[in-house]
């Protein structure tokens, strides 16, 4: 009876400690994996945004509306892209892969804009983490990642004959690209499931090993 009581308490203590350690490990692993996947998506989104802006740069410089519109439509039709928009400094959408957006105004107090505006004035430079946002169109919709890329007034812009932008105007507009996170969220869920299965399996296996060791090294000697 005494041996069984000691063995039971010892087993319970070891299992409780193991459960706590493995649970903490699982939580941190899930969080780290999720953050790593999201950082990779943010990096990819930033590269896509820079590529799109560079690809449209020549057409914007020559104010070629048709080519800009065609380029944005082509990019917006890609499976990994949800929508591509370009709006001017005033917040009016002038190009979009969704034509119903064109001509509408963006709320500068919305999440996609507030990082660029401080008391109504856009800041000059933004880090990648400050240019991205994660949101849902509605509570039941999949998550989306959006990235904004300010279009700065370079010398080739304010010296071009077809443009009327003064040299003092720093930001001409913003390129906004949104990408679905459906695949990323699926990978996150799979990783979470794998970590949970590993944690549960480790706890069960450790419990069996501890029970056998306690029975062999504690219960049997005490009974003798």
Task: Give the role of each language-model region.
Residues 55-110:
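Extracytoplasmic/periplasmic helical hairpin
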Residues 1-9, 30-38, 182-194:
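Juxtamembrane/transmembrane-helix boundary motifs in multi-pass membrane proteins
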Residues 13, 27-48, 57-68:
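Membrane-proximal amphipathic alpha-helices
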Residues 34, 210-224:
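Cytoplasmic juxtamembrane amphipathic helix immediately C-terminal to a transmembrane segment
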Residues 2-31, 198-206, 210-213:
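Extreme N-terminal signal-anchor transmembrane helix of membrane signaling/transducer proteins, especially
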């Amino acid at each position: 009876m005494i041996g069984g009581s000691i063995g039971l308490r010892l087993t319970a203590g070891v299992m409780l400690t193991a459960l706590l350690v493995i649970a903490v490990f699982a939580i941190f692993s899930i969080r780290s994996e999720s953050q790593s996947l999201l950082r990779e998506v943010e990096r990819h989104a930033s590269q896509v945004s820079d590529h799109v802006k560079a690809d449209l740069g020549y057409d914007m410089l020559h104010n070629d509306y048709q080519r800009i519109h065609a380029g944005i439509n082509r990019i917006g039709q890609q499976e990994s892209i949800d929508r591509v928009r370009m709006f001017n400094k005033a917040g009016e959408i002038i190009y979009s892969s969704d034509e119903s957006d064109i001509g509408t105004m963006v709320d500068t107090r919305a999440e996609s804009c507030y990082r660029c505006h401080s008391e109504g004035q856009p800041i000059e430079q933004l880090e990648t983490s400050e240019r991205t946002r994660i949101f849902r169109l509605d509570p039941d919709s999949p998550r989306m990642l959006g990235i904004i890329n300010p279009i700065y007034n370079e010398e080739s812009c304010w010296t071009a004959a077809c443009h009327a932008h003064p040299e003092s105007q720093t930001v001409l507009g913003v390129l906004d690209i949104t990408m679905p996170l459906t695949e990323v969220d699926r990978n996150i869920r799979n990783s979470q499931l794998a970590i949970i299965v590993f944690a549960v399996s480790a706890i069960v296996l450790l419990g069996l090993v501890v029970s056998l060791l306690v029975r062999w090294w504690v219960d049997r000697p005490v009974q003798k």
